[in-house]
Amino acid sequence: MKRSISPDPFSSTKSPKLVHHSPDDGGAEGNPYRLPFTLSDENLSCLPISQAREPPPIFNLDPNSVKDTQDRNKLYLAKAWDLLKPAIKIILDDDEYKKPGDVLCFTTIFRAVKRACLGDPRQSELVFNLVKHECEPHIAELIQSLEKNCSGSDDPSVFLPHVYNRWLDFKRKMSLVSDVAMYQTLNGLTLWDVGQKLFHKQLSMAPQLQDQVITGILRLITDERLGKAANNTSDLLKNLMDMFRMQWQCTYVYKDPFLDSTSKFYAEEAEQVLQRSDISHYLKYVERTFLAEEEKCDKHYFFFSSSRSRLMKVLKSQLLEAHSSFLEEGFMLLMDESLIDDLRRMYRLFSMVDSEDYIDRILRAYILAKGEGARQEGSLQELHTSIDKIWHQCFGQDDLLDKTIRDCFEGFGLHVPGEFSDQLQWIDDDDDED
């Protein structure tokens, strides 16, 4: 399958041109070359290499000339690296090859790496180490450049687009390195993964830059939550958050600041909403918030998806638990007026955070508060009928709540027929007939 990759439109670097040659094209004197993007046509997909010679006969070596397997593997690896190393340099430096001369086909590099690594994980590890050693100075230089360009700027709209462009350019280059190295994997990691780890290593050695980027990301997230974000913020955020994808073990790097920022934001916003809302409007606000945050998780906003369970706990804490007295009073009002949509919404919200037991507790309190008066007035059955209707329509026929309703009313002396009790009665009747 041919794969076409366009140069990054945001990159500030000048991309070399892609030139195809026929087999008769010889030296193609005066033409610039760049790394090809297809593996299927070795006559068209060529990469310039300084002082390249005719492709060495690395696939037709006489077995008798190399008797020792270890020496043969070393020879394969050395020849593969002779081809791969200059290719990596061209990719990372975005070099344009302007000197006339021979070209070395991409597929030749591809096959050489395959021959060197075939069936021997130790050889793959050596290739990985060589590539890491070749790439790390370039990545260190990239981080130093970002430090220099971003220092002294606290405005995310100024420095984050620059970081974004350089990150996209880095992703493009490391993807090409992985391509030309035959998509080698080691312990489940690709060369792209290795490149990203090196990026994080160098970024962690520049803590001021790292904190600056994370702070900028959090400010963009806040703007997006407030509806102030520009149209392109979503793509910008997703790519910037992906910079930290391989740092999943270092929760203090991005998770803790993200969750702290989220907690502070919703604590303040919930207070503002409560000042101008009744129970119905507040429940709608909480539902919109839950759905918006879950949507970001589903759309692979990395900070959100990697912190999903903790994020939902923060929302539960700041939007529900922190205002439990308000919600309990509101629940009583909703039950009194049988506001089905709001009761259904309230149950759904607490179910989303696995807190059905909270609904169970306030439902029990409601029945006990209303039941004594209903018994004295002789309207206990009417109260049960009303609550049972709400249970069917709003509470998903939750078994826990059903048991609570049954226990409370039976405590007031009202017999509550049900499927389970009716089945026992039917069994008892059969036993009496026998």
UniProtKB/Swiss-Prot annotation:
Residues 1-34 are annotated as: Disordered. Belongs to the cullin family. This is Cullin-like protein 5. InterPro entries: Cullin, Cullin_N, Cullin_repeat-like_dom_sf. Pfam families: Cullin. GO terms for biological process: ubiquitin-dependent protein catabolic process. SUPFAM superfamilies: Cullin repeat-like. PANTHER family: CULLIN. One of its GO terms (molecular function) is ubiquitin protein ligase binding. Signal peptide: none annotated.
